[in-house]
């Protein structure tokens, strides 16, 4: 990059920038034009722009100019068992900027029974003093009651929060019952908020964890063995079903397996309003590392749902991201030191969960999807920025290069090649799960709020300059279809006359649990009930248990790395 302009320009003009000779890439079009920015906003786009004096000019030399990335899933400065992730809001957002991300959406995780509002204010206090890029917040619902219900309504209407995550896992901590999911989805749909879900079957996981420990499996491999992808897929299916019944939009976080991707894809094809979020880890690597002889390396990959041991999974997920079956990407960046991970050295259930990915996200997607020809540059912008802005009602302020939009821009070099290393990354973590990976595509210049935050690999981030960006309810991108369906889905009783015929006397009915006409020792064979899956909104892929005939009793096969090549059913 070359830079032109006067040195020591007055402060009043220091926020004036002109990018010349770049190729602007939005999610729907690409074209050559210059961009003039002032006071943190894009003021002009076109050729031969008339701009004030004292403007700093950046020559893009034909390189791509894209909207800054939006990472929709981070866990910075996250407390856990008296510890805190090693990347706080400053270190984490600095790493984000280094990778071309100019906005994050972090998760507020209240302690069970704690106030959601107080937790939000605590996260705001942490972030406001440290972030060096803009941020918004999701709030996780860790328990459900009338008081929580009131708080959720306040957060939506007064505090700028429009998305809430619920857990189907972490039994006896955060896990919600089906009834609670139904109530929460119904309530969020009425408020115009987005229901996010961590989808895993927590009840079965708890049983499987105990079984692994009883077998003497205490290392990181026990994590993935106790959380097979069928448990993720079952929960995804259940969440989609409940969300459909309540006419609430559903956002599935951390999509990690082929089975889950297939279910989301299938549901969307049938018209369900559901969005899927793969993360940097599931797009860039796999779960074969859980069997590493190096405990610290294996533990670095521990996250939930776990990475798939099938090494073909990342390519599969990238393909469905490119095809539009998945819409948005996050990093789920939650970094713990090796010493912190080691509290679970003798019991994998105690290993703090989380991987890095905030800095690598955009390069991983470019390398795995664009450089391989799966998606084009416009789709890249959509899945790294624009779709996130649309889903969370930030568009077109964020996620687009247009007059009036925030001047969060990245000059992207598709030909740049970098080798990922913990020695050179900007995270405070001493490991990197993408260590040694050669990635094509990287940012040359990163501009946030109209200020140059990175140029030629050098960061100029300033702590505390990030702003909280409120998210309003009822985003059109999500709720237009929901509103139309609400109008069409009004239920009415069938008008009919009063029934005046005989009514059976319940007093003469046999006691519940005693089938009429049966006697002890009766030779009559009872027909086993068969569930008709065709009655559901959509079916699971592959043969179902009802369809497979006689099966071997209680035989379980544990797949080694590379085992389950393409699990697409829950049978």
From Swiss-Prot:
Gene3D superfamilies: Metal-dependent hydrolases (3.20.20.140), Urease, subunit C, domain 1 (2.30.40.10). Induction: By the neuronal determination factor neurog2/X-ngngr-1. Repressed by Notch signaling. GO terms for molecular function: hydrolase activity, acting on carbon-nitrogen (but not peptide) bonds, in cyclic amides. Residues 502-530, 542-571 are annotated as: Disordered. GO terms for biological process: actin crosslink formation. Residues 516-529 have a biased composition (Polar residues). The keyword Cytoplasm applies. InterPro entries: Amidohydro-rel, Hydantoinase/dihydroPyrase, Metal-dep_hydrolase_composite, Metal_Hydrolase, Metallo-dep_Hydrolases_sf. Expressed in the prospective neuroectoderm at the end of gastrulation. During open neural plate stages, expressed broadly throughout the anterior neural plate and in the three bilateral stripes of the posterior neural plate where primary neurons arise. At tadpole stages, expression is maintained throughout the central nervous system and in the eye retina. Its main location: cytoplasm. Keywords: Cell projection, Cytoplasm. NCBIfam families: D-hydantoinase. Necessary for signaling by class 3 semaphorins and subsequent remodeling of the cytoskeleton. Plays a role in axon guidance, neuronal growth cone collapse and cell migration. PANTHER family: DIHYDROPYRIMIDINASE-RELATED PROTEIN 3, HYDRANTOINASE/DIHYDROPYRIMIDINASE FAMILY MEMBER. Belongs to the metallo-dependent hydrolases superfamily. Hydantoinase/dihydropyrimidinase family. This is Dihydropyrimidinase-related protein 3-B. The lineage of its organism: Eukaryota, Metazoa, Chordata, Craniata, Vertebrata.
